Amino acid sequence: MQYEWRKAELIGQLLNLGVTPGGVLLVHSSFRSVRPLEDGPLGLIEALRAALGPGGTLVMPSWSGLDDEPFDPATSPVTPDLGVVSDTFWRLPNVKRSAHPFAFAAAGPQAEQIISDPLPLPPHSPASPVARVHELDGQVLLLGVGHDANTTLHLAELMAKVPYGVPRHCTILQDGKLVRVDYLENDHCCERFALADRWLKEKSLQKEGPVGHAFARLIRSRDIVATALGQLGRDPLIFLHPPEGGMRRMRCRSPVDWLSS
């Protein structure tokens, strides 16, 4: 039977990893990798908030993934692939949540500034919660997940003006009516986001260590973006899969593939 980590131990691990008290922390997590621990997902959230302290702001992804249904920040559950920690977080008292389908949730002094922008299109554009974390010089914690879950790399793609996109849509309520909104998203399988692991480690920009039973990575958002922009400046298609018949392919989460020559 695996050891059950106590919250006090998790707080120590987070601080040893380099979480900044009073800072902004964007967390992508897999509770399955972290567990078992005292008080389950809630215990992990409490440990994260304790490590940040009262002056810190905790941020998590909180979108529903339901393209054909309007988003309600008070009731819409998160898409299952974001995990139980994210789905627990937005339901807690004093947690603020974006009022659009590409929502993030946040708690702390900077929460309103991070989540209050209107619908960002594409979702991780320079007017998105991910971008606000970047502007506030926040950190990104990948807790039991890899860079394929790192939404800050999508921000870097858009800042680099990558020449690819996938047709997407979402549904909003406008004057009491359902309205479909179409847009292009820099969405793909994200497998090659794993390249960022080596880039950041080579520059000693990525801190690594255990949190609970999980392997954790901690990086400044600005370091992620600056490093990715440097690589995308040399090869705008570096996050796409290698050429197949002279073309670079986006392996997408949907049946749609968009090809870039």
Curated annotation (Swiss-Prot):
The keyword Transferase applies. The keyword Transferase applies. GO terms for molecular function: aminoglycoside 3-N-acetyltransferase activity. Keywords: Acyltransferase, Antibiotic resistance, Plasmid, Transferase. It catalyses: a 2-deoxystreptamine antibiotic + acetyl-CoA = an N(3)-acetyl-2-deoxystreptamine antibiotic + CoA + H(+). Its EC number is 2.3.1.81. It comes from the Bacteria. Signal peptide: none annotated. InterPro entries: Amioglycoside_AcTrfase, Antibiotic_NAT-like. One of its GO terms (biological process) is response to antibiotic. Belongs to the antibiotic N-acetyltransferase family. Resistance to antibiotics containing the 2-deoxy-streptamine ring including gentamicin, kanamycin, tobramycin, neomycin and apramycin. This is Aminoglycoside N(3)-acetyltransferase IV. It comes from Salmonella sp.
